[in-house]
């Protein structure tokens, strides 16, 4: 019974063909593309306002060199939010609960920010490995610690997103199962459990959006250090 709770995190397949690629492509079909041939409706207006506000808040603390990343980070933000929210629907699959997918986003983007710093400002980039004013005896130890913390960054990005979404989905399934079992035995308790499930669902919607924002925000902070 305990193992069945994790079946929702298995990559679905049809006739031996994995369907995770279809789940990844669906978000791009949801957002309408602006065009000059038609007037913008309310959905397009809200979408444009959200993208502009997010891009402004993300790029404001950066210098001009980091503004080239605005399109990539905004697209990644919309992609993660859409996948996370679609995964809350019944009988759906959430690709971002797979650590492999999150690491596939985290490692290349983090590595790109590091390479940009090494190519453009090698002295400043290497200076991050040694805090200013460090005693001579602590220099080797601190360099090792800072190097390890540097390489842990992509792992922290991927694991944070995976762990939060996985924990939320498991908790929702546990409470939903309890409500379903108790509905014939103790209807009052089942009603209270359903209310808790409703509140938890609202919380998970917020977590789905917040975790996507945190993922992109941390990438922008890593980029800000190297541009």
Curated annotation (Swiss-Prot):
InterPro entries, A to Z: ATP_synth_F0_asu, ATP_synth_F0_asu_AS, ATP_synth_F0_asu_bact/mt, F0_ATP_A_sf
Subcellular location: Mitochondrion inner membrane
Lipid bilayer topology: Multi-pass membrane protein
Keywords, alphabetical: ATP synthesis, CF(0), Hydrogen ion transport, Ion transport, Membrane, Mitochondrion, Mitochondrion inner membrane, Transmembrane, Transmembrane helix, Transport
One GO term (biological process): proton transmembrane transport
Catalysis: reaction(s): H(+)(in) = H(+)(out)
SUPFAM superfamilies: F1F0 ATP synthase subunit A
Membrane-spanning parts: 14-34, 69-89, 99-119, 137-157, 180-200, 202-222
First-listed, main subcellular location of the protein, grouped into a coarse class: mitochondrion
Keyword field contains S-adenosyl-L-methionine: no
Stored Pfam families: ATP-synt_A
Cysteine disulfide partners in this protein: none
GO molecular function, a single term: proton-transporting ATP synthase activity, rotational mechanism
Subunit structure: Component of the ATP synthase complex composed at least of ATP5F1A/subunit alpha, ATP5F1B/subunit beta, ATP5MC1/subunit c (homooctomer), MT-ATP6/subunit a, MT-ATP8/subunit 8, ATP5ME/subunit e, ATP5MF/subunit f, ATP5MG/subunit g, ATP5MK/subunit k, ATP5MJ/subunit j, ATP5F1C/subunit gamma, ATP5F1D/subunit delta, ATP5F1E/subunit epsilon, ATP5PF/subunit F6, ATP5PB/subunit b, ATP5PD/subunit d, ATP5PO/subunit OSCP.
Job description of the protein: Subunit a, of the mitochondrial membrane ATP synthase complex (F(1)F(0) ATP synthase or Complex V) that produces ATP from ADP in the presence of a proton gradient across the membrane which is generated by electron transport complexes of the respiratory chain. ATP synthase complex consist of a soluble F(1) head domain - the catalytic core - and a membrane F(1) domain - the membrane proton channel. These two domains are linked by a central stalk rotating inside the F(1) region and a stationary peripheral stalk.
Family as reported in the entry's similarity comment: Belongs to the ATPase A chain family.
The protein, known as: ATP synthase F(0) complex subunit a
Species of origin: Squalus acanthias (Spiny dogfish)
């Amino acid at each position: 019974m305990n193992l069945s709770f994790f079946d929702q995190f298995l990559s679905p397949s049809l006739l031996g063909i994995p369907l995770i690629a279809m789940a990844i492509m669906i978000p791009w079909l949801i957002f309408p593309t602006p065009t000059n041939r038609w007037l913008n409706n309310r959905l397009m207006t809200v979408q444009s306002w959200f993208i502009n506000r997010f891009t402004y808040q993300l790029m404001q603390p950066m210098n001009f060199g980091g503004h080239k990343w605005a399109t990539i980070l905004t697209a990644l933000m919309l992609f993660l939010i859409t996948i996370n929210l679609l995964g809350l629907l019944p009988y759906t699959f959430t690709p971002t609960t797979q650590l492999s997918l999150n690491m596939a986003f985290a490692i290349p983007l983090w590595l790109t920010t590091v390479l940009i710093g090494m190519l453009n400002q090698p002295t400043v980039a290497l200076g991050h490995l040694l805090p200013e004013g460090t005693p001579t005896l602590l220099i080797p130890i601190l360099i090792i610690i800072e190097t390890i913390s540097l390489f842990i960054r992509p792992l922290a990005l991927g694991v944070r997103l995976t762990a939060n979404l996985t924990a939320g989905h498991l908790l929702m399934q546990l409470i939903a199962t309890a409500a379903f079992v108790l509905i014939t035995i103790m209807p009052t308790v089942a009603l209270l459990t359903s209310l808790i499930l409703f509140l938890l669902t609202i919380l998970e919607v917020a977590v789905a959006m917040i975790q996507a924002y945190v993922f992109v925000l941390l990438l922008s902070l890593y980029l800000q250090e190297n541009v």
